[in-house]
Amino acid sequence: MAFSYRTPQEELLSRLPQSQQEVISGFQYERIQKEEEKKVENFSFYLPEKTREWFTKSGVYLSPFAYVNHSHPGCKTLENHLLFNVVASYISKYSYVACLSIKSNKMSKMERLGPNSVKTYDILNRLVTAKDKARYGPLAKPERSPCPKKTNIFIHDEIHYWSRDQLETFLQVHRPKNLWATLVFPPEILAGYKSSVLPFLYQFEIHGKDLVYMPDGVRSESYTQPLENGFLLSSSSIIIKNRVTGVEIRYQVSLVYSLGSHHLFHIYPAEDLMKEEVRRFGPYDLFDVGSLFVKPVRVPIQDFPLSVFKKIFIYMSSLKKPDVQSAVAKLRQLSDADISIESVFMIQEFASRIEKNGVESWSCSFWGCMKDWFFDKLPYREVLEKIGLADDFTRRLMKIKPLAFDIHTTDRPLTVRMIIDQIWEERLSSFDNISNIVFYGRREWLNNGVLPKVKKKGLAKLIPGREVDSHNYPREIYSDLLSSTSIWRSYDDDFRHRSASPLVILRSNRAYSEAAKFSSNCLSLCAAPCDEVIARTPFELNHRREKKELSLKCLDFHIKKMKVKNVLELEVKLRERNTRISLSKKGVKKAGRSRMIPVHLLKPTCGEGNGKPEERNKEEAKIPMNEGTSKEEKGSEPPHSEVKREGVRLDEQHISEPLLSFKLDDFVGREKLCSAGLIKTVGNDYLLLARQIECMPLSQLRGKKAAYFCLDFPMVYFHDKVSYPTFEATGEIRHVMMKARSKWGIDFNSALIQVYNDGCRLPLHSDNEECYDDDGILTINVVGDAKFHTTCHDEVIDLKQGNEILMPAGYQKKNRHAVEVASEGRTSVTLRVHKRDFSFESKLRFIKGKFDCLFVSVAEIIHKKPEEIMMFIPHIMDRCVSNRGCSLDDAKAICEKYEIKIECEGDCGLVECGTSGLSIGRMLLRGNHFSVASVRRSSMDSLANSSKEIKSDGVLDHVTFNFHKRLKLVEPDLTNADIKVDSSRAGKLLKSLMDGMTGIVSHNSTHEGWRMIKGINSTSEMRSFMNMVRGQIEEPKSDLFDKVQELNFMKVKIYGIFGFAGSGKSHAIQNLIQTEFKGSQGIMVICPRRFLAKDWSEKGVDEKDIKTFESALKSDVKGKRLFILDEISLLPKGFTDLLMLKMHMEGILKKSTIVCIGDPLQAGYFCPKDDNYLSREGEIKRLFKGGVNYKWYSYRINKFIAKKLAIETMNDFIGIDEQSSIYKDMPSAHHFMEKKGNHIEVILVASMVEKELYSNYGNVMTFGESQGLTFNCGVIVLSEEAKLCSDAHIMVAITRFRRGFCFALGSKGSKEDYMRSMKSGLLQRICSGVGASKEFILGSSSVNLILSEKDIAKGAGIDEMDREARLEGDVWLKSMIYLGKRYHMVEPLGQVIKLTDDAIKCHIPVCSSQTLGPELDNIQAREYREFKGKNGWSNQFREEAGPNWKFPYKVNQAMSYEAVYPRHKMDDDLTFLAAIKKRLRFDNVANNYAKFKAAESRGKYLTKIFLKHVPIKCGRDQRLLDQCRQEFEETKLSKSAATIGAHSQRSDSDWPLDKIFLFMKSQLCTKFEKRFTEAKAGQTLACFPHKILVEFSPWCRYTEKVLTANLPDNYYIHQRKNFSELEDFARRFSNGSICVESDYTAFDVSQDHTILAFEVELLRHFGWDDRVLQSYIKMKCTLGCRLGGFAIMRFTGEFSTFLFNTLANMVFTFCRYEVPDGTPICFAGDDMCALRNLREIDTHEFILSKLSLKAKVNRTKVPMFCGWRLCCDGLIKEPCLIYERLQVAIENGRLMDVIDSYFLEFSFAYKLGERLYSHLEIEQLNYHQVLTRFFIRNKHLLRGDSRHNISELEWLSDEDGDNDKGSQIEDRRRGYSNCWGEKLQNLF
């Protein structure tokens, strides 16, 4: 880290003794004390942090104890500084000063300033503004006060109200010697800025000739002053004339001091002094945005903080993939809460530019210099940049600098307005309005009134784009009928000429809120020409949508207000009113408003009706202008208003015509019923629909008849226990649905028709089935009466015939509704939007156990699960749901799909279902129920014509549609190619297989090889098929031939993953299957080696889906969608083509994915029988002729071999000493390898003969057999056969080993003889030590290799992940994480020898699990166990089986194993309240701080005690701290990107750091002491923002590492350790003596202010930064949540909760007990166990009495720690506890999730063997024996290491079947039957 610079004085002081340093610091203290006494009154205002920093940098004194509140503290502090620090120092030297416009109390303060005090003065005030009356008191008079002449005058904050003439007159009259004046005026105005450069200190606005100044941005404190009166800033002198003599007198104007907007001027008679020609201001922490972004913007922003911009730019430059979201997140992190929206948009624009185009480099090439030179010479360069025809963004970015400006002074400066006009001269003087819109943005263009002057042609030229489409909603609503609300129209001046459409404007707030439910007035925007071509922005499109919605609501509102019920009533009213309307071409002049009828309601005239529809619509968009609408409109009439206008003429003739519109029905008769948006309509005619319903096939249900109709047929619909028959919507029901779509704007596609019996009731419910989104729902009351009730209001709605009820979108989430039928035959139609089908799980729940008898019967016959059949034939399942059962037709459909035959015996005889083959079973159909009568034995699984589908979890579709997409994301080196199946190549391999030349189990005559292809039923058919495939049949006429010919017109995409040996070719795809597709039966892996199959099975592929190439061809592939060909080079030539042929014949080729994995540099397939018959081209070259992406690196081979092969390796091991040594024979090689401790795992030979020869030396394999395997060490035999091997086989041999290998001669002669006879190849290069070059190796490949090399750090730097990609979903956290290169320290490897105990055979008596059941009698009734409240009980103990109960039968849950323990759930309010009451304490911040301050001395005392027992050196190890920060970030980023993105809300910078989210942990409390207990309070968890974790977690990790490194051996902390380490500690220190345990009460709550003081003092000793410590104290003292502020306490979920709990536990133990040196003690959070009998002491009682932390002392001979028994033989977990947990998992169907972890706990006790009798009583031994039998019998369920462990332990069991319970064990202190008694001796 970088150290700060220290001056020589600081260096000297740091070396002086402490006493001398204190003497010098005493002087500084006295000086600060005096200064504070003098200035505290004027500089103690509380200022925001940014303002404080600015004042400090400006040299303004601020009191360190700022507490005084003020409305504008910043400007007040600045004024005081100017008065008492600056002005006083200048005017104090005068004997007399006349003071104007200043309060007396300020002058009295200036009297008390010591050396700078003002001695003699007069206060002469006058009233300038209205506030001066109150400011100066009643003595001030409005006339000018007498002011002495030729004296010294000081004017305070008034001169900015004086004009230049007034100041000149004042100087002329009084002729002062010295005039000192303070001026408040933002200087940036004179530089052309319209906004403040110090917005945190002041802001201003310019309104015409006035300047509105707002101190601290507070608008209520603002005052107005003339804009022109800032002339002093640009004046160098003022010239006046003597009234008597007329002589000119020059007064010099000097700017003595300027800070912000406050200035001090000294005006005095001119002397021969240099003038101030330039006044310089700045630099400010801003930059001119216009200098970077020259293009026009919608809303201008002039400045932006430069420091923030630099940090964002540097951050963006450091990202590999900069994006807009990251930049905005960084802006939010760097800014306070008061961030402007314009700044966000600016950063978005900047980041978008960087993301899209990047930034050019700083260095410049020749052509780059030429381009810059050419750009500089361009004429109109700035104009070209503004309109986007040229760009110099990078150079503008490089030239950004802090904002600064100069003001040049003169004797006669320009006025401020003239200066502004001069700066903006281009805009104001330009008459080219097109240029104005480009330069200044459309918004400003409109505001400055440029729009009326722009002609249509000019606008079209400016923004070419697209046509404006015609409106389909009313654009005008002006008529006498709408007179209840003030409605006006607005248009531009060229309205008639441009045929623009006016917009509706509601001037009344009341009308606005009633009509549109908005709260503010609508804005009037000029409409665009209807005939022009204009490109619309997203803003315009959104505005247009809002305008349409507003217009429709307006019309609806007024029609409802007119109280018309139908169209006819509206037509009558319109006729009555229209007789009074007369319109002519000149228009009718009226005062106040336009009287017009809605244009969209008019029918076109006869002439127009003959025209084209487009023209008629265009004409309807034009209306005559009403010239007399208002004075304003009349005044703005353009000179060409007399042009004849076309439009709809609203005369008597037109009005007499019918005024019907197809849209009008939509607005008449509607009634809004409640605020939730419920709408009712009346007067609808559904007689035709009622007639159609009478003829519909409705299903009889309880109290009604019903059916479901869909536009998107077929769909199923059901809910609860009811399902409905489904039909396609046709006829009138379809017409009604389409009409409702148009009327309501909702895409209805389903209708539920129900005919009710009288009195039928539907209770309160919501239509929230999973097939729906929260769209609108329309209920049509076709016939009959009903009452409709909702929860959104209390009124009951009566539904009559023809009524409609619309429940809008979002209604179902918040409200429910109920219906009561009031008449027989009442018919309703409910229209909904059926978005999706029900899930498979929902359908399965509906039919399972009730309607699934057919699926169960067929599944039993064909040995499958019913769910698999349902998934394979989903439409049969849908019919079963709709019809509530299956029929014979469904059975036939299932058999036809599976191509099987099943007999079904029913009431009408025997029926055969299916037509293929013999019957494989018989079913009975009795009483609408299918059951199995008999099942014939069949080789169903081996037939190619049977189908193996996928599981019932929908994995098939998941694999089909998603796998190749996901594979592209996780595998960067994926290769793909489009392949056409080569039939001749496939035919050759097929014939070779049938003839027995290839393979061993595919011969046609002996192994029924004809079963490989679907549709082939005999050998003869297969022979004909082979001839057809090879093209040897001239005119074949069959379906098979047509099927094969289809392949000539198909291309299949093949994917490939290729790489060097050990490069991890299968790693990504295996991880993908393991994490996302595990257990899918839609996957088939084809492996040529048995060991490869084992690897795939461990990675999540079912063993039965891993095939050799022959078994793959003979098996059924119909249910597969993913085919992985591992080591494709070892597959026979033509296999891929034959496999694709087989897939095509079964109809799955198009929807399947094929992935090939292999290495072109390794050995390929070879068989002497078929070598001359099959194609010569290998599979890789055949499929990927254009080359493959190749992983040119390895994780396997050591550095020695990697160097020889010119490849990079991630294996850090250099190589064994015998690496590549050649020994004379095998015994010599074996001897020397074993002597150096290199165990030989394999011997590789070149031929099978050699394999037999060396078989007695151990594991021997040929080069080809070892392909794909990995070993540590081995021997390669050099024989004559090895000389003949290809380089590919040699490559296989030398790349099998991690650590290394040696050679052994296997031929006669010496090493030199062998080397001389070798050919020049890879083997010769390796044996000679020369090595092979990259070119040599790549030249041996059959295809072009596109190398993908790993970026391997040459030193210790390793970048282990793409952190930016991982953080893509959490841009807030991205800004907190270090994204640079990480460095890992590589620790030297050492060999650790660990002795293992000999296993002891153990005889375990057999015990029946039935004997363990009676213990459940200890469970009390639920009413005695639960918490009870006013509104019910808690819900910790289950009594009844829930709907998802998966146990074979529903048992009494009150006696289940889960009922033994309390369960906490998030929705259990009483448990949560109990948790709050027990585990939380509340207090205010002031009390927390006060208590902490009082406890600081106690904290130091506790730290001293702690360090006495755990000595730790004071100071900080910065390297270790950096490493901890790196480890924390790596751990944080080790989660998947999806998981990080899901928690992104925790990274939000707006999350208050002193607030947490509190919730309760959902868990089953399976601790031993919780068995059979009453309800327990929940465990509260705290969720902190990520900023807290990022800040403190690295320091906590550092503390943990330092503590661990310095911890004495006799202390054990169970953190980041496994149980084997705890076992070693117990064996080492446990001696069977009495042990001591501390049982803490409310441990987290008890960690109060005293513990916090201890933590702070200890962490300071550890080297924590003081800033971090202060932040930690603040967090602990101010933390709160929605419930209120917390007292100082510990929270579960807080960073490093375990560490701080452990520290508190340790210091309490050291205070409570006498702990001699060497005493073994285990600590883990609040758990403590001392393995010796410690004596309690009262030495530290005065401290312990102050602690809230209390503990009960427990002495025992059976110590328990973290739920484990500690004994001299190791660890034991209570067997009954494991047994009951297992039973709970079995009850809940979660055995597979927990069996491995429970086995791990069990194994510690199991490996103790006979020694277990010394530690367990007989009851626990019975549990242990039952567990032993369970794990042995279910070992096939174990995975990973557990499977190996059970195999190692299995032989220890020596059961003989006797049920020997042994002797009894009485109560003991800790254990099975009693937790309070002392342990007794075993009675065996």
Curated annotation (Swiss-Prot):
Any GO BP annotation: viral RNA genome replication
Residue sites binding ATP per the record: G1059, F1060, A1061, G1062, S1063, G1064, K1065, S1066
UniProt keyword terms in alphabetical order: ATP-binding, Helicase, Hydrolase, Nucleotide-binding, Nucleotidyltransferase, RNA-directed RNA polymerase, Transferase, Viral RNA replication
RdRp catalytic domain sequence ranges: 1633-1740
Ranges where the Fe2OG dioxygenase domain occurs: 747-835
EC number(s) on file: 2.7.7.48
S-S bridge residues: none
Alphavirus-like MT domain: residues covered: 63-232
Positions of the (+)RNA virus helicase ATP-binding domain: 1032-1191
A GO molecular-function descriptor: mRNA methyltransferase activity
Domain (+)RNA virus helicase C-terminal stretches: 1192-1336
Bias-annotated ranges (Basic and acidic residues): 611-622, 629-648
Domain of life of the source: Viruses
Official protein name in the record: RNA-directed RNA polymerase
Species: Apple chlorotic leaf spot virus (isolate plum P863) (ACLSV)
